[in-house]
Amino acid sequence: WLARSEEDIEKIFNKQLERLQTDYIDMYLIHNVGSKLWKFTEKYNVLDFLTKKKEEGKIRHIGFSFHDDYEFFKEVIDKFPWEFVQIQLNYIDENFQAGVKGLKLAGEKGLPVIIMEPLKGGRLASTMPPAVDEIWSQMKEKRTPVEWAFRWVADFPEVTTILSGMSSYAQLENNL
């Protein structure tokens, strides 16, 4: 992180508002929460800072993106009155990081959940192993690998939004 003090956090936040040309941010996300970076969050009182900014009307909703194991996810989700979370989830990584268990826990707490990496960095968007193709070919519904990956994530009622990176118009159309 670029901040090395509580004062730096204030400066960085004000610079973000300036770059966005706004007086407030609707959804402010602490990125890359994990056990190592969480120490920084605690050391520099980041949660107190964000609470203050919310009270001032400069932040509307506070959330975090998570990159650690499920046990740490349980700790973080109970440390603050979060308003949304972002986790990695796809049909290969259902037990990776927060995983499906984290998704379910966030849902139990009534938190909107944003999913990142539904295509595992594009690896689930291309050719599948023959065994997978064989199973999919037997399905009544015919879908592309991208459609299967999105459908798997979207079928969880706890999922609010699915993010997907794209580098071409064709990928954009396929993601819709």
Stretch-by-stretch model annotation:
Residues Y24-L29, K58-G63, E83-Q86, G110-I114, ...:
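Structural preference for beta-strand elements that scaffold enzyme active sites
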Residues K79, V100-L176:
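Structured C-terminal cap/extension of enzyme domains
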